[in-house]
């Protein structure tokens, strides 16, 4: 897709949506010299959505992220893009309807290359009441979804449920209900939202940490930033600043020296990843627990199983899973499996934090059960809470609150009509997968894999291999991915470190038993020419990544959060100049 807005000095053969080294240098210069309408803090899905919403209203936008795009909550979800079936028990009908509308919109229009339909089985284990109770809930869920791109529910006897999921324990099953929902690679989706914002003119820069809020009297007029790579500092001026930092909301709020309208509480959610052959099933599963639900979701050649829900008051950047977390997940899922899972079956584990609203203060906040928008100081807007699926609505609400500080008339949100990069032409390319594969010497399944990660941007990815066909070969110890995907992550997707690539642009860190260690050097050598790494840089990146994996694995054997956090914190930061926490003075 061609870019209609070319930044000054940005024409290096790549569009502005390509978040590579050249764009990064230009972005730093622009941040320190230009006046912006909106400065967004936070490169998660909500912050990226805010940047896209504001840019497509015609505003001049800057987005700064202290670490990597989606490095927090937005890469560590259950990978569900759903309405929230469990919220119906809480009678949150309006919220579920809103989320289901967003699901339909992304599935059909905004991001069909990233958001995918998936059949789920709800195993029934209670003899008389469970089927009508769950069926009524799923029926309402289907009806609230409105326009249908997925089939309605279907009921099964025990024999029928076992045909769908032969791996279930026969003695604990009386039947099942199949329904459809959708899944997404959250990190890739978030990165694509940010790149789409850049396509429409937003200045997007990672490793750019906010360390101060600039003030003029009682009004916030911008932010002080620090480069997390080299410690350089700059001031970024904007008519309004949007705090979309999730679990870091209170930390940024503290920089304003104003009392916040709400506080955010971090809740830890842990997932485990096991090979597909450990659970024999043709469908995903949703299991009831005492407090919530547990998802068993197919993920390529694996299953993702989770989640937990416990308070977390330690390191926000690196939440750690414990042995107790993993035991809880295994115990829950093993209650319905014919062949129990063990710790030895696990290929990957990840922990993320949900930003939950802990309370709110007055009527100036726009509040809902799901998210809240507030104006804690003139020129400062904060948004928190919510769920991944409704990121677009959250972003529109935040920018609606921000426009009062912009000295010009501002158009309403139009992101309902703005497809993400890669969506345009996706369905046609799926039909042409065999032809594309023949031209590139790739198997059609490999082309479809690329299409489901890049959509119509596949042409940009493959173009990188035109001068070096060896990039089309698989990564030796992670053959599910091509070398060119690593190179493209560095050249166009904002990746600056090995961790960014192995954990977020690709999911090697959770999809292989070695968690990326065995392919770290190979991938580092592929991206070194793109990022200008020396041999010493390669050695440092590999060592840092291996230390991260070792710390995570050791922490996952600990009995409690405190001991797990201490071990995880022992690994060095990939971004050497990151400040954690930001000093308030």
Swiss-Prot record:
- Chain sites annotated for binding FAD: 37-65
Where it sits in the cell: the answer is: Cytoplasm
Q: Which cofactor does it need?
A: FAD
Q: What is its main location?
A: cytoplasm
Q: Name one GO cellular component term.
A: cytoplasm
Source organism per entry reads Mycobacterium tuberculosis (strain ATCC 25618 / H37Rv)
Query: What GO annotations for molecular function exist for this entry?
Result: glycerol-3-phosphate dehydrogenase (quinone) activity
Entry annotated with the keyword DNA-binding = no
So what family is this one in?
Belongs to the FAD-dependent glycerol-3-phosphate dehydrogenase family.
Domain of life where this protein originates = Bacteria
What does it catalyze? a quinone + sn-glycerol 3-phosphate = dihydroxyacetone phosphate + a quinol
Give the protein name, as stated in the record.
Answer: Glycerol-3-phosphate dehydrogenase 2
Recite the lineage of the species: Bacteria, Bacillati, Actinomycetota, Actinomycetes, Mycobacteriales
């Amino acid at each position: 897709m061609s870019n209609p807005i070319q930044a000054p000095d940005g024409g290096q053969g790549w569009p502005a949506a390509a978040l590579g080294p050249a764009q990064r240098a230009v972005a730093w210069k622009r941040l320190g010299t230009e006046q912006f309408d909106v400065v967004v803090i936070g490169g998660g899905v909500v912050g990226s959505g805010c940047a896209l919403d504001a840019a497509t209203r015609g505003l001049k936008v800057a987005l700064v992220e202290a670490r990597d795009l989606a490095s927090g909550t937005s890469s560590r979800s259950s990978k569900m893009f759903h309405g929230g079936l469990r919220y119906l028990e809480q009678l949150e009908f309006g919220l579920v309807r809103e989320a289901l509308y967003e699901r339909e919109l992304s599935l059909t229009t905004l991001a069909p290359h990233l958001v995918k339909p998936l059949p789920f089985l709800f195993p029934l284990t209670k003899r008389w009441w469970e089927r009508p109770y769950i069926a009524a809930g799923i029926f309402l869920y289907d009806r609230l979804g409105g326009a249908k791109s997925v089939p309605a529910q279907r009921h099964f006897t025990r024999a029928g449920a076992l045909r769908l999921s032969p791996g279930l324990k026969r003695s604990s099953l009386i039947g099942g209900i199949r329904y459809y929902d959708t899944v997404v690679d959250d990190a890739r989706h978030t990165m694509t939202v940010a790149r789409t914002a850049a396509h429409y003119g937003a200045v997007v820069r990672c490793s750019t940490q906010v360390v101060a809020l600039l003030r003029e009297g009682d009004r916030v007029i911008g932010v002080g930033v620090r480069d997390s790579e080299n410690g350089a500092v700059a001031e970024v001026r904007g008519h309004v600043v949007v705090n979309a930092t999730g679990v870091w909301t209170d930390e940024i709020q503290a920089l304003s020296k104003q009392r916040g309208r709400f506080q955010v509480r971090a809740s830890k959610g842990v997932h485990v990843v096991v090979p597909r052959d450990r659970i024999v099933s043709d469908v995903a599963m949703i299991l009831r627990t005492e407090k919530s639900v547990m998802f068993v979701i197919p993920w390529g050649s694996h299953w993702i199983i989770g989640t937990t829900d416990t308070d977390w008051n330690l390191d926000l950047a690196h939440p750690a899973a414990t042995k107790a977390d993993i035991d809880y997940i295994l115990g829950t899922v093993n209650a319905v499996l014919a062949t129990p899972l063990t710790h030895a079956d696990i290929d990957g584990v990840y922990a993320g934090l949900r930003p939950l609203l802990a309370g709110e203060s007055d009527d100036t906040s726009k509040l809902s059960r799901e998210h809240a928008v507030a104006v804690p100081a003139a020129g400062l807007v904060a948004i928190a809470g919510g769920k991944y699926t409704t990121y677009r609505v959250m972003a529109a609400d935040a920018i609606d609150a921000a426009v009062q500080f912009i000295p010009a008339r501002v158009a309403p949100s139009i992101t309902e009509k703005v497809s993400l990069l890669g969506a345009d032409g996706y369905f046609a390319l799926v039909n042409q997968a065999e032809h594309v594969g023949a031209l590139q010497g790739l198997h059609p399944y490999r082309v479809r894999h690329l299409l489901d990660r890049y959509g119509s941007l596949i042409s940009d990815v493959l173009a990188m291999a035109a001068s070096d066909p060896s990039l089309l070969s698989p990564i030796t110890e992670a053959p599910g991915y091509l070398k060119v995907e690593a190179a493209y992550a560095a050249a166009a997707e904002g990746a600056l470190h090995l961790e960014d690539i192995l954990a977020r642009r690709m999911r090697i860190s959770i999809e292989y038993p070695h968690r990326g260690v065995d392919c770290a050097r190979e991938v580092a050598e592929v991206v070194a020419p793109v990022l200008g790494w020396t041999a010493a840089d390669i050695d440092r990146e590999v060592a840092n990544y291996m230390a991260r994996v070792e710390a995570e694995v050791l922490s996952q054997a600990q009995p409690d959060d405190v001991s797990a956090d201490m071990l995880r914190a022992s690994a060095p930061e990939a971004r050497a100049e990151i400040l954690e926490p930001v000093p308030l003075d």
